[in-house]
């Protein structure tokens, strides 16, 4: 089906405003929250001073979801909810880190060629073996 007349274009101006709103209201990433809930840093991030700019004066805070709530009842109902339980489940596993991304991948046997162009294989142990592939020709009379 085609588009209706008068609805041309991609509405890029709306996309700009949506992008600005989404980046302004962006929540913390899993790896940042994982670092905050470690035993050595949990005291620093779990206690807040009274701040009139935050909801509930900054006293009702869910450390797993990184959200402030207006009342303690709102916090308790949030803890019983599904989004909180999903976030806690995600935080049980260690997040993917930069160091893990830089580990080289070992896929087993690697095929290299020597100076003559003959394929040689290198084992996982590092020993080099020459491949012994021979070609046979058959003649038909």
Curated annotation (Swiss-Prot):
Annotated transmembrane regions: none
Quaternary structure and partners: Associates with pre-60S ribosomal particles; released from the pre-60S particle very early in the cytoplasm.
Biased composition (Basic residues): 10-25
Name under which the protein is recorded: Zinc finger protein 593 homolog
Signal peptide positions (record): none
An example molecular function term from Gene Ontology annotations: nucleic acid binding
Listed InterPro entries: C2H2-ZF_Maturation_Protein (IPR051879), Matrin/U1-like-C_Znf_C2H2 (IPR003604), Znf_C2H2_jaz (IPR022755), Znf_C2H2_sf (IPR036236), Znf_C2H2_type (IPR013087)
Positions of C2H2-type zinc fingers: 60-84
Superkingdom assignment: Eukaryota
Gene Ontology cellular component terms for the protein in this record: cytoplasm; nucleus
Primary role: Involved in pre-60S ribosomal particles maturation by promoting the nuclear export of the 60S ribosome.
Keywords, comma-separated and alphabetical: Cytoplasm, Metal-binding, Nucleus, Ribosome biogenesis, Zinc, Zinc-finger
Pfam families noted in UniProt: zf-C2H2_jaz
Residue ranges, annotated region (Disordered): 1-32
Record GO biological process: ribosome biogenesis
Localization in the cell: Nucleus; Cytoplasm
Similarity comment text for this entry: Belongs to the ZNF593/BUD20 C2H2-type zinc-finger protein family.
